[in-house]
Structures are given as structure tokens and as C-alpha cells.
UniProtKB/Swiss-Prot annotation:
Its cofactor is Mn(2+). CDD domains: DRE_TIM_IPMS. The gene is leuA. The lineage of its organism: Bacteria, Pseudomonadati, Pseudomonadota, Betaproteobacteria, Nitrosomonadales. This is 2-isopropylmalate synthase. It is found in: Cytoplasm.
Length: 510
């Protein structure tokens, strides 16, 4: 029987550090439940000491998840570890993940600590975490640029202190696959007590090598991979969970281990995360991109028709791609609606939330002849973007005529008040945004405006993503409607609501 490769998902922690990808507590719980449904072994829910909001989100995930291990990140200081322990106590399999920097540049310039002092601090942190759980993970931050002799010393010491998982991060995505795999092999060979711990890796994608480095590490003895859905994460992102899992599954002739992931849930999970964060999946993205199983070349099409394995190394249905079939219509009832949401891996928090989305579904069905699974994902994501709206669109009139200056008029609810404004612009969307700004005066900088059609057809639901920046804070707004101008207004207001309710966070780089 093959060894098990532990899949450690950090979408809720490291993935959230993608600029604009902040999530509400309810959104984190929805994603965590889907990760559990997919069979993820460990869910890193966040950094409890970062803020009250992060603490409450980790606590909510720990309470919502029972089969997967829920993990909280903490620096190697007692106060952080205490917050993690408190937030995670509802999860029977809780894990505390503590870290400290070990590269010369970090120890000298950031920590301003000697190597011996760093080892002492790491030992103390692991022992302190063991008061809460035996399931303790330790990471030497920036291991890729750390001296090998020092790494061996500190890892041997934390194993003796009780750490059962050793995570080796390539924090800045600097190493090459052979180099990183060799590092894992060397550590396992040189550390006397290495057999008492599981070696894990956490690779960043700055050079586009996160998945390659992770797989190289697996071939050299790593038995846990830290990854994110769609490769979300700081800067260029992390190793993509779907790529790691399917590489190991597809090449069982090559890898000495396997995962317990239900791969048929991959596409649904990808769409859920994309919808909540507002980060669309690129069409040519491996496994979950819209073109991942498309063949346009005549030669390729002919080969696939004759024998699928000529050009397909895995089946689309194995990762959750199915026929884009007609699903529901305006005569469909609430039970059928609920049943299909459940089949798509979507579980809503309450009957009230179901009723709200069902009403929106009925409105969409009146406008759109065919309702597809993608439409349902968009409706749920649009509704769940933010729990309390400080700004709400009440009405919108946009006018665009050839040879005339586009014009928009909006009415927005701000708290208990209603305000109206109108503006001209270079186009109907620009005019709408300018009218909104006359009311909100957010002074935010528009960094991104993106429109995606959810399904085919001129009556397709349009999905708009807006990215705003204000005083260093970056947020993504999301809106969906058959009217692109209305979807744009919703997305802009959604982003402004996030700016209004944003919380300051500390983002550790592991």
C-alpha cells in the first residue's frame, strides 16, 4: 500500500494575502466546508493573533469543520500561540503552526537575534504550543536561503521539543526543483531524529516553480504539501492544490504516495474560491481552466474522437467537469433549487439565506431562458460577498447613444438615507462610477475592471470584478447581473463596502 501524501490547504490564510482577496468570516466557513467535503487533510484557517476578525474567523472554521484538521498560524511567541489555541479549541484535531525566520538575512535584519537565540525561541514556542495540542507544526521561515547546518540544528531541536510536522518553506520562490528536492533529502538524511516527524513543503510561485518544487520534494521524502486553490497567495501565489493532486494521481507510476482527495470536487471548489475572492481563473489554467480539456486542432480532435487517451492524460469528469447542461427554470421549486446547490457543493448558512438567493434565482429565470450551474455559482458568490452593506444600489439609469456623451443616474442607500447623483462619463460604466463617487466620495483608485460572461448567449449572466486601492488597502468587488452596467455598479459598491468595513491585519510571510 502506498504512503499517504497529506494535503494542507492554506487558501484561507496565505491565499487571502493575494491583493484584494480578503474574505468575510461567512465566506471562509463556506470554503472550509467545501475543502472538508473534498477531503483536504489540514485546513489552515488563518492567523488568529492578526486581528479580532481573524480570530473569530478561525474560531468559526474550527467549529464548522469536524473531519479535517483545522490549523492556526502563529509566530514563535507565547501570545500568538495562546490566541491560536483559544481559537482552535472546538476542533478535535486542532493543529498549531508556529514559525520563526532562519535565513541569515532575516535573523540579522528582521529578528536581530543570534542563531542560538533563534533556536531557543523555536524550542520554547513548540513546547508552549504542546500545552494545547500534540499536533504541532514548525516552519523555519525562508528555509530556501537558510544555511543547511543551521537548519539541521534547529529542526533536530524542535523535533525533540515535540514538533511532529516540519514545514520547509521556499518563502520567496527562489529555489530550483532539483535544489529544493535535494534540500529535503539532505535534511532527512542528516537530522538524527527525522523519522519522528513528517516533512512538509510550502512553495511560492515567484519563478513559476511552486508545483515543480513541491513535487520534487515529494519525490525526496516530503509527505505533506502546503498549497492553495487556484494557486492563490502572496505575490505570484502558491503551489496550486489541483495541480499537485492531479499530478500525483495521474502519475501513480512515478510517485510513491497518493492523496485522499475527492478529485471530482476540484472544479466546484475552484469556482467557489474564484467567485468569493473575485479572482477569475485564466482559461488556460491547468485542470480548472475553461480550456483545460478543449481541443481545437483538427489532428487533436480526430485523435480524441478515435481514442481519448491520444491527447488526454486524465478525464474531465474526474476533476468535476461535466456537460454544461440546462439545470433549472422559472417554474423550478425551492426544493429542486436547494438540491442542485447541494450537488454543486454549496451549503448555505440558513433558510433565510436560501430564500434570499432563491428570490434572486427567480428574478434571473424571468430574464434568462436557460439557467446553468455557473449561474448558480455566480448568484451565491454575489450574494455572499459581504454580510452587511453600508452602501446599497437602489436604482440605476444609464444612457448611451452614438454621438452623445454617456450619462448615468444612481440612487444609493447609505445607512438609513437615500442619495441621488448623476454624472457624464467616457462610457456608461465610467458615468456610473462617477455618479457613485459623487455620493460616496471614497477617493479610492480603480486598479482593475474585468467583465466575464458566466455562460454563453447574449442573455448570459455577466460577472464584473472591480479592484480598488485606498491608503495601501486593496479590495476586490464582485457583481453579477444580466445587465453589465448594473453588475458594474454592484461590483463597485461591493468593493466600497469592503473598504468601509475593512480590518487591519498582520500578514506573516511563510
Amino acid at each position: 500500500m502506498k504512503e499517504r501524501l497529506v494535503i494542507f490547504d492554506t487558501t484561507l490564510r496565505d491565499g487571502e494575502q493575494s491583493p484584494g482577496a480578503s474574505m468575510t468570516m461567512e465566506e471562509k466557513v463556506r470554503i472550509a466546508r467545501q475543502l472538508e467535503r473534498m477531503g483536504v487533510d489540514v485546513i489552515e484557517a488563518g492567523f488568529p493573533a492578526a486581528s479580532k476578525g481573524d480570530f473569530e474567523a478561525v474560531k468559526a472554521v474550527a467549529e464548522a469543520v469536524s473531519n479535517s484538521t483545522v490549523c492556526g498560524l502563529s509566530r514563535a511567541i507565547e501570545a500568538d500561540i495562546n490566541r491560536a489555541g483559544e481559537a482552535l479549541q472546538a476542533n478535535q484535531n486542532m493543529r498549531i503552526h508556529t514559525f520563526i525566520a532562519t535565513s541569515p538575512i532575516h535573523m540579522k535584519n528582521k529578528l536581530r537575534m543570534s542563531p542560538d537565540r533563534v533556536i531557543e525561541q523555536a524550542i520554547k514556542a513548540v513546547k508552549w504550543a504542546r500545552q494545547y495540542t500534540d499536533n504541532v507544526e514548525f516552519s523555519p521561515e525562508d528555509a530556501g536561503r537558510s544555511e543547511i547546518d543551521f537548519l539541521c540544528r534547529i529542526l533536530e531541536a524542535v523535533i525533540d521539543a515535540g514538533a511532529r510536522t516540519l514545514n520547509i518553506p521556499d518563502t520567496v520562490g527562489y529555489t530550483m526543483p532539483d535544489q529544493f528536492g535535494g534540500l529535503i533529502r539532505t535534511l532527512r538524511e542528516r537530522i538524527p531524529n527525522s523519522d519522528k516527524a513528517v516533512f512538509s513543503v510550502h512553495c511560492h510561485n515567484d519563478l513559476g516553480l511552486a508545483v515543480a518544487n513541491s513535487l520534487s520534494a515529494v519525490m525526496n521524502g516530503a509527505r505533506q504539501v502546503e498549497c492553495t486553490i487556484n494557486g492563490l497567495g502572496e505575490r505570484a501565489g502558491n503551489a496550486a492544490l489541483e495541480e499537485v493532486v492531479m499530478a500525483v494521481r495521474t502519475r501513480q507510476d512515478y510517485f510513491p504516495c497518493d492523496t485522499r482527495i475527492d478529485t471530482t470536487q476540484i472544479v466546484s471548489t475552484s469556482k467557489l474560491v474564484s467567485g468569493i475572492t473575485g479572482f477569475p481563473v485564466q482559461p488556460n489554467k491547468a485542470i480548472v481552466g475553461a480550456n483545460a480539456f478543449a481541443h481545437e486542432s483538427g489532428i487533436h480532435q480526430d485523435g480524441v474522437l478515435k481514442h481519448r487517451e491520444t491527447y488526454e492524460i486524465m478525464r474531465a469528469e474526474d476533476v468535476g467537469w461535466g456537460a454544461n447542461k440546462l439545470l433549472l427554470g422559472k417554474h423550478s421549486g425551492r426544493n429542486a433549487f436547494r438540491s442542485r446547490l447541494k450537488e454543486l457543493g454549496i451549503e448555505l448558512e440558513s433558510e433565510e439565506k436560501l430564500n434570499t438567493i432563491f428570490i434572486r434565482f427567480k428574478d434571473l429565470a424571468d430574464k434568462k431562458h436557460e439557467i446553468f450551474d455557473e449561474d448558480l455559482h455566480a448568484l451565491v458568490s454575489d450574494e455572499a460577498q459581504i454580510p452587511e452593506e453600508h452602501y446599497r444600489l437602489l436604482s440605476l439609469v444609464a444612457h448611451s447613444e452614438t454621438g452623445e456623451i454617456p450619462f448615468a443616474q444612481v440612487v444609493i442607500a447609505t445607512g438609513n438615507n437615500e442619495q441621488q447623483a448623476e454624472s457624464e462619463g467616457s462610457g456608461p460604466v465610467d458615468a456610473t462610477f462617477r455618479a457613485i463617487e459623487k455620493i460616496l466620495n471614497s477617493k479610492a483608485e480603480l486598479q482593475l475592471f474585468s467583465v466575464n460572461n458566466i455562460t454563453s448567449g447574449t442573455d448570459a449572466l455577466g460577472e464584473v470584478t472591480v479592484r480598488l486601492q485606498k491608503v495601501g488597502r486593496i479590495v476586490n468587488g464582485h457583481g453579477a447581473d444580466t445587465d453589465i452596467i448594473a453588475a458594474s455598479a454592484k461590483a463597485y459598491l461591493n468593493a466600497c463596502n469592503k473598504l468601509h468595513s475593512s480590518l487591519e491585519r498582520t500578514h506573516p510571510q511563510v
